[in-house]
A protein has these predicted regions:
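Active-site beta->alpha loop and helix N-cap motifs at the rims of alpha/beta catalytic domains
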Residues: 4-5, 9-13, 19-22, 27-100, ...
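Catalytic alpha/beta core domains of metabolic enzymes, predominantly
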Residues: 107-109, 120-166
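Short active-site oxyanion
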Residues: 1-3, 21, 83-85, 106-108, ...
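Anion (oxyanion) recognition and catalysis
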Residues: 51-52, 102, 123, 156
Length: 166
């Protein structure tokens, strides 16, 4: 099991990193906005600051929702730092982008996963990580942990290397 922090707050990241147990950080546009980070250049600079703190993977999410846009942003983000993992939504265009980026050696984190079927698509496309929305499922009276259990079991049975972040 790995410990990832879901935040863009540098103080929280420093504090968790000081414990010596932090394996990585995941971010998203909402978390960046909450920290007052604006624009693509502001986000890129912030990702670099996070990478300087953490000796582990840092998920940086694309803003585009079309294949071409996700691929373009994904390449740009991946070129910032070796620890950047491109976070892409689990939509049809996102699965195509994950597959394309995988072919280019770019690591990805497939987010907005609500079902084992979506997790299967992400793994088949070559995602490094998959991020099921456990909290959201729990909020709507679904069992988020059960989803994680099903995904982990499926990946184990079929030999997928994709890791589950929950």
């Amino acid at each position: 099991m790995k410990f990832f922090l879901d935040t863009a707050n540098l103080a929280q990241i420093r504090e968790a990193n000081a414990l010596g147990v932090l394996d990585g950080v995941t971010t998203n546009p909402s978390l960046m906005a909450k920290e007052g980070i604006k624009g693509a250049e502001g986000c890129k600079q912030h990702y670099l600051e996070i990478c300087e703190i953490v000796n582990g993977d840092v998920s940086a999410e694309v803003l585009a929702t079309d294949f071409e846009g996700m691929v373009k942003e994904g390449k740009e983000l991946a070129s910032l730092h070796p620890n950047i993992v491109v976070k892409i939504p689990c939509i049809a265009e996102g699965i195509k982008a994950i597959r394309y980026l995988y072919g280019k050696g770019i690591r990805t984190n497939c987010t907005l996963v609500f079902s084992p079927g979506q997790a299967l698509l992400a793994a088949k496309a070559g995602a490094t990580y998959v991020s099921p929305f456990v909290g959201r499922l729990d909020d709507i009276s679904s069992d988020g942990i059960d989803l994680v259990r099903k995904i982990v079991e499926m990946y184990s049975i079929y030999g997928f290397d994709t890791q589950v972040l929950a």
